[in-house]
C-alpha cells in the first residue's frame, strides 16, 4: 500500500503511520518476558516474580517504549520509500480515529528545501588588500615597547627630565593615591581605598577622578564632586553625586625600552639582530593581514550568496541552531567564571536572526559544494594545518595535535570547504579590489 504524503505548506508534510496491534503486542510480551528475568519484587527471588505481576507493573512503560521504537522505525521506512529529505525531528500524534486492529499516528515534519542559487556573475564583492611597510612595523614596535613599559619614581633620572620629586602628575604617569568618597556625608562600599595605583590617561577611572589627580604633587590633596553615570555597574551609586577627596601618595614616570639588541632578544631573536626582528614582525603582520582579509572577504561572499539565493528555511533547523547557540553562550559564560552558567536563563529568541542566517547559509553552501565539487581534499587540509602551525614554536607538535583529534580535523575541513567556496565565487563574481591600511583592516575585521 502506497504511503500518502500530505503537503501542509512550503516545507511541512504529514504522513500516517499504522502499526498492527498484534505486532506491537508480540514485542511488548517479548520485552516483559526479558524484563522478568531480572526484575526484583518484595517476597520473590530475582527472576522468580510471576509474569502476570511483572506485566501489571510494567506494561504501560513497556508499551510506550515499544510504540516509540516502532513509530520511529516505520517513519524511517516511509521516508526512505518516499525519498523524503526530512529536516529536523518529526512530531508524532495519535489519530483521533483508531482502527480496532492497528495503532494510527500522524507524523508531522519538514523537508529540506529546493535551493536556487542565482547567477554568480551578478554577485558583487569588495576585496580589501593591504601592504605591510616600515610604518606598520614601526607602529607595531611602538605597541610592543608600550607593553614592556616600566616606571621610575619621581626624582630618578630618566627621559622625562622629570624635574624631581615635587613634579606634578601628568598623563602617562602611574600614580598611587588614597581616596575617600561620600554621598550625603555617608561613606559607601567601594568609595574608599588606600595605596590605589592607576595610570593617568588610560581611562580606567571616571573622567572627574582623573582630572582631579592631574597636576597634584606628592602629599597634596584635592576634593571634588563626581557624578556616577546612570548605567554605572555599581547600582547603589548609579546616577548619584559623590564628594571625593584624593591624596597623592606616589608619582612614577613611564620608561619604554629602547629598540636595541636586548629588546630584540626579548622578542625571541636570539642573536638580537634588529634586521631579523623587523623581518619577523613584517612576516607576522602579513600573516595577520591575510587572515583578517580572508575573514572580511568570506563574510562579503556569504552575504552575496544569500542575496542571489532563493530558498525556504525549515523552522526545525532554525530552532535546533538556536538551542546550539544558547549552549555556546552558556559555555562562554562558564569559561568567564560566571556561577551556574550552565543553567543561565538565556532566551533562544535572541538568536533567532543569527540562527536563520546560519542555517540558510549552510543550505546554500551545501548545494554549491555539491554542484561544483568543492569538497575539501586531504592535501588542502594538510596545507592549512601546516600554515596554521607555522605561527607556533613547535609546528610539528601542532600538526600532531590536529591529526590526533577528528573533531579538530573536521573543523579544519569545514574551513577549507568555505575557502573553496570563496575562491570559486570570487572567480565568477564582480570583484573590486580596495587598498586599505592595516589599522582600517583590523577595525573592519573586528566589526565583521
Swiss-Prot record:
GO cellular component, one term: cytoplasm
Keywords, ordered alphabetically: Cell cycle, Cell division, Chaperone, Cytoplasm, Isomerase, Rotamase
Keyword Cell division: yes
TM region positions: none
EC number(s) reported in the record: 5.2.1.8
MF-aspect GO terms: peptidyl-prolyl cis-trans isomerase activity; protein folding chaperone; ribosome binding
Primary enzyme class: isomerase
Family: Belongs to the FKBP-type PPIase family. Tig subfamily.
Name of protein: Trigger factor
Amino acid at each position: 500500500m502506497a504511503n500518502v504524503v500530505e503537503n501542509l505548506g512550503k516545507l511541512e508534510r504529514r504522513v500516517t503511520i499504522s502499526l498492527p496491534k498484534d505486532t506491537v503486542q508480540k514485542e511488548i510480551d517479548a520485552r516483559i518476558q526479558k524484563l522478568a528475568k531480572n526484575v526484583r519484587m518484595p517476597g520473590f527471588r530475582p527472576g522468580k516474580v510471576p509474569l502476570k505481576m511483572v506485566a501489571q507493573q510494567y506494561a504501560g512503560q513497556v508499551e510506550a517504549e515499544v510504540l516509540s521504537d516502532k513509530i520511529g522505525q516505520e517513519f524511517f521506512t516511509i521516508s526512505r520509500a518516499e525519498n523524503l529529505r526530512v529536516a529536523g525531528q518529526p512530531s508524532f500524534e495519535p489519530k483521533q480515529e483508531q482502527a480496532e486492529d492497528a495503532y494510527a499516528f500522524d507524523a508531522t515534519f519538514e523537508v529540506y528545501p529546493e535551493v536556487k542559487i542565482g547567477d554568480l556573475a551578478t554577485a558583487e564583492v569588495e576585496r580589501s588588500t593591504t601592504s605591510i611597510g616600515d610604518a606598520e612595523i614601526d607602529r607595531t614596535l611602538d605597541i610592543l615597547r608600550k607593553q614592556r613599559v616600566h616606571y621610575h619614581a619621581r626624582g630618578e633620572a630618566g627621559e622625562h627630565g622629570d624635574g624631581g620629586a615635587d613634579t606634578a602628575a601628568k598623563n602617562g604617569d602611574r600614580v598611587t593615591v588614597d581616596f575617600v568618597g561620600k554621598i550625603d556625608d555617608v561613606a559607601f562600599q567601594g568609595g574608599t581605598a588606600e595605596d590605589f595605583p592607576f595610570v593617568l590617561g588610560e581611562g580606567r577611572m571616571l573622567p572627574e577622578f582623573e582630572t582631579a589627580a592631574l597636576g597634584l604633587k606628592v602629599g597634596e590633596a584635592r576634593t571634588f564632586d563626581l557624578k556616577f553615570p546612570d548605567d554605572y555597574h555599581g547600582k547603589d551609586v548609579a546616577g548619584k553625586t559623590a564628594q571625593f577627596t584624593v591624596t597623592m601618595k606616589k608619582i612614577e614616570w613611564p620608561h619604554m625600552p629602547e629598540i636595541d639588541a636586548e629588546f630584540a632578544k626579548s622578542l625571541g631573536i636570539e642573536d638580537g639582530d634588529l634586521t631579523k626582528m623587523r623581518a619577523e614582525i613584517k612576516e607576522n603582520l602579513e600573516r595577520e593581514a591575510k587572515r583578517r582579509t580572508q575573514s572580511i572577504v568570506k563574510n562579503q561572499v556569504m552575504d552575496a550568496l544569500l542575496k542571489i539565493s532563493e530558498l525556504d528555511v525549515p523552522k526545525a533547523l532554525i530552532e535546533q541552531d538556536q538551542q546550539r547557540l544558547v549552549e555556546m553562550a552558556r559555555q562562554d559564560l562558564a569559561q568567564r567564571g560566571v556561577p551556574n552558567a550552565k543553567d543561565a536563563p538565556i532566551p533562544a529568541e535572541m538568536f533567532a536572526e543569527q540562527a536563520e542566517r546560519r542555517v540558510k547559509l549552510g543550505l546554500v553552501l551545501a548545494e554549491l559544494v555539491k554542484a561544483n565539487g568543492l569538497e575539501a581534499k586531504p592535501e588542502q587540509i594538510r596545507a592549512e594545518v601546516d600554515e596554521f602551525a607555522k605561527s607556533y614554536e613547535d609546528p610539528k607538535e601542532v600538526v600532531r595535535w590536529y591529526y590526533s583529534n577528528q573533531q579538530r580535523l573536521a573543523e579544519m575541513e569545514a574551513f577549507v570547504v568555505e575557502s573553496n567556496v570563496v575562491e570559486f565565487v570570487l572567480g565568477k563574481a564582480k570583484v573590486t579590489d580596495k587598498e586599505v591600511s592595516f589599522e582600517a583592516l583590523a577595525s573592519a575585521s573586528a566589526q565583521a
